[in-house]
């Protein structure tokens, strides 16, 4: 489990069966089978690729841009802002 705190940036992370909670910025993340990336309020995911079995969840006031959602991948939002 990785937590990207406010004002912090994580770049080039690959999630396979792990979880990343984004309160800051996550760039160029790849989410594979069993991986979960959760973007919290005021967090931002940029250039994320979601592969089969992976999940990207964007909570209220979170932001996700330049997302690639491949077949079998899940993109869940509680808000339409920033998608």
What are these model-derived regions, one by one?
Residues 1-2, 6-19, 24-29, 35-37, ...:
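The right-handed parallel beta-helix/beta-solenoid scaffold, focusing on the short coil/turn
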